[in-house]
Amino acid sequence: MRYNQFSYIKTDGQVAKKELENLGFHFPISNKPKEIFRSFLNTYFFQSSDKDYQIASFIADFETDLLSFFNADKPLTKEIFDMVSLQLLGFIPGFDFENLKEFTSQIAFPVPFNENDLFASIHHLLGTRHKNGMLLIDDLISKGFLGPDNTYHFFNGKTLATFDTSQLIKEVVYVEAPIDSDNDGKSDLIKVMILRPRSQKQIPTVMTASPYHQGINEVANDKKLHSMQTDLPLKEAHKIHVADASISTLVCENADLPITENTEQFSYIDSYTLNDYFLSRGFANIYVSGVGTADSDGFMTSGDYVQIESFKAIIDWLNGRAKAFTSHKREAYVLANWSNGKVATTGKSYLGTMSNGLATTGVEGLEVIIAEAAISSWYDYYRENGLICSPGGYPGEDLDVLTELTYSRSLHAGDFLRQKEKYYQLLNQQSQAIDRDSGDYNQFWHDRNYLPNAKNVTCEVVFTHGLQDWNVKPRQVYNMFNALPGSVAKHLFLHHGQHVYMHNWQSIDFKECMNALLCQKLLGIASNFQLPAILWQNNQEEQKWQSLEEFGTSNTFRIPLGEGFAKISNQYSTETFERYSKDFKSFKRDLFSGKANQLSLEFPLDQDLQLNGEAILHLSLTSSVSKGLISAQLLDKGLKKRLGDTPTILDLKVMDNGQNFSREDLKELPMRESTERVISKGVLNLQNRDGLLEVQSVEADQWLSFDFKLQPSLYQLRKGDCLQVLLYTTDFEHTVRDNSDYELRINLEKSYLSLPIA
C-alpha cells in the first residue's frame, strides 16, 4: 500500500480537539502527549471494558508492548506514535514491515507527529485510510462508535455514517417531463425510485440516471447487432452541414389535484455502492431510467436532449418546478418536501454520460456531477473520423442496438403489445438516421453531441476515466474537460484501468474526496477542502498518484518515421479473414506479435518523455484504389512490469459503506509483467482526412498528406523504453471488415510522429 491522501483537510490542534470531543473522545486536563494518547486509545477501544488487554495487544517498539510503555517512564516519541498508528491502521509489525522508518517512507505515511499539538496528529490519524480502504474514523463508526441516530455528524469536513440504513424509506413516484417522445399526444411520465433515510431535516440527493436500471433486453440487442463484414463505402465528395438545435418542450397542465403521500413502494434495487456510501451519510438516493424504460412513458431516444430532459425533470421536481404523480392515473400529486433541492449525479458509462448531458442544460439545483467513463459525443462513441468504429469489445453494436437493449418497456408484454407498432416505426427511423452506410457525421449525431453546450455548464464537475478504456475512449473526457468554461470548477481522475469504477481502490481516497466536496456543495459545510484539477495515476510506479494542472499541452517532440517507402496490404487469405472476423482477439494477438498486415516501426528512447495529450501522425501516403482506411496504435514495447488494466481484489467485503451496510471488495490495479502496453490508437477514413464536416475524394496512387490525431493519453516513458508505431488498415475490433484487395504506400521520409510533451 502507498498513501495518496487528497481528502484530508489540514486542521489545527484547537479545532481538532473540539471535533474529537464532539465525537465522544475524552482527554485529561493534562497536556502531556503520553496521557493524551492513552486517553485517546481508551476511547478508541470502546467495544471492550478491558482497555489494558486491548492496549497490551499492540507494541510500542519491537521490544516493548504498548501497555508496558504506558506503565514505564518513557516519553511518547514519533517512532512510538508511528508504530501504534500503523497498527491501528491495520499494518502488522514483523509481517507487513520490519523497519519502521523505511516502511513509513515506502508507504508515504501522511500523519505528522507533533508532541506540542498531538490533537492535530490524532485528528489526522482518524482522517487517514485504514489498510482496508476505509478512513480510520469510518472504521470506528462502522463498528458502532456513534449510533445511527439519523442526524448529521461531521468530522474533517465530511459527514459520517450515522443514518439508519435498516429503516430506509423506499418509494416510487412518476414525474411529469415536458416532452412527448413517442408522439402519443401526452407528456411522458418518468418512474423515479427513491431511497432515503429518515430525517427531521431536508436532505440533498445523489441521483443516478441509468437507462439500464429497469432492466435490459439482451435478446433484442443481440438480434439487432450489425454485421461488420462489409465493404468500405466509396463516398461522393461533399461538405456536411449541421446546426445547433434545441428541443421542443410542452407546457404541462397545472391541474387541480389533491396532494398526497406516495402510494407505491419497492423492496430492492441493484444499487451503486458509491450511492450507498452517501445514503448512510444523509443523502437520498434516486435511480431513474428515463423515457422508453419499464414503467415510464415514451420512446428510447438514446442520447439526445429529449432523453436528457426526462432526467432534468427529476431535478426540477426536487426543486418544486415540476409535478410528480402517485401513479400513471395522474390523480394525485406528490411533493418532494423532504428535499433541500441540491443534487449530485453519479454513475459510469451511459450513466455518467447522462450526467454530462444534464450538466450542459445548466439546470438549477444540480450542484455536482461525478461522471465516470462518460461520453461527451455519441458520434465519437460509435464512429471515428468518417468510419464505423465499434466500442472496444463490442463489434457490431450501434446506437439503435443500444435502443433495443434499453427499451425495457418491451419486457412488460402488455405494455409492449400496445406500443410495438409505434416503437418499431420510431426504431426504424433511428436506424436510418445513424447512417451506417457512410459513417459520416450528420444532424442526428450533432443532436447527441454535448460539447457545443459545454458553455452552459455551471455545476462543479468531477470526471474519472481510464486511459486503457477503449469502450468509452479517452477523447470523450479530454474534449469535455477542455471544453468547459473557465468559470467552472473541474476535476479529473485519470487512471490506467479500462472501463471500470475506481471508488473502492486502495491507492486513492476517492470516496472521501467526494464526501468533502458534496458536504461543501450540497450541505453547505464551510471547509478548506480543495480538490486538484487533475489527479493522474503514475504508470511507472505502483499506487502512485500525482496532481497536474492540465490534460493536453502545446509542446511537441517530433520523431521521423524513417527513410524510403513502405507498403501495407489490406487483403488477407479467406481463412485468416474468417478467423479474425470470428475472434478479433486473435487479430490483436497477431498484430502485437507482427503477424498481421502491418507496418511496425520501433523507436528506442534516449531520454525520458511525459506524454500529455493527443499524439499526431503526419502521414504522406497513397492508396491503390479511390478509398481506404488507416488504423494506428502507439505502444510501449518490451517486457517489463506495468499496471494491469483491470483491478484485482485485495480483500473481500472489507469496505463497509455504513454500519454493516453494503460491504464491498477492496481493489487495486496490479503491477504485472507484460510485453507491451497500448498508449494510444485511432482509425481514419482517408475520405475524411481533413475533418468530420468534409468528405473528400481519394485518387488512386496519388499522394495525400494529412494529420491523423490519435486518442489522447497521459503516459510516462523512460530513457531506454521502446516506442512502437503500428500502422495497418482494417481493425477487426473496431472498424468494418473490408477484405478487398488494395494497399497503402507510405513515404516514411515525409511522415513523422508528433508527441505532446509535458
Curated annotation (Swiss-Prot):
Transmembrane spans: none
Name of the protein in question: Xaa-Pro dipeptidyl-peptidase
Q: What is its EC number?
A: 3.4.14.11
Give the InterPro entries listed for this entry: AB_hydrolase_fold (IPR029058), Galactose-bd-like_sf (IPR008979), Pept_S15_Xpro (IPR008252), PepX_N_dom (IPR015251), PepX_N_dom_sf (IPR036313), Xaa-Pro-like_dom (IPR000383), Xaa-Pro_dipept_C (IPR013736), Xaa-Pro_dipeptidyl-ppase/CocE (IPR050585)
Q: Which reaction does it catalyse?
A: Hydrolyzes Xaa-Pro-|- bonds to release unblocked, N-terminal dipeptides from substrates including Ala-Pro-|-p-nitroanilide and (sequentially) Tyr-Pro-|-Phe-Pro-|-Gly-Pro-|-Ile
Q: Which GO terms describe its cellular component?
A: cytoplasm
Answer whether the UniProt record assigns the keyword Ligase to this protein. Answer: no
User: In UniProt terms, what function does this protein have?
Assistant: Removes N-terminal dipeptides sequentially from polypeptides having unsubstituted N-termini provided that the penultimate residue is proline.
Q: Which gene encodes it?
A: pepX
Location(s), subcellular: Cytoplasm
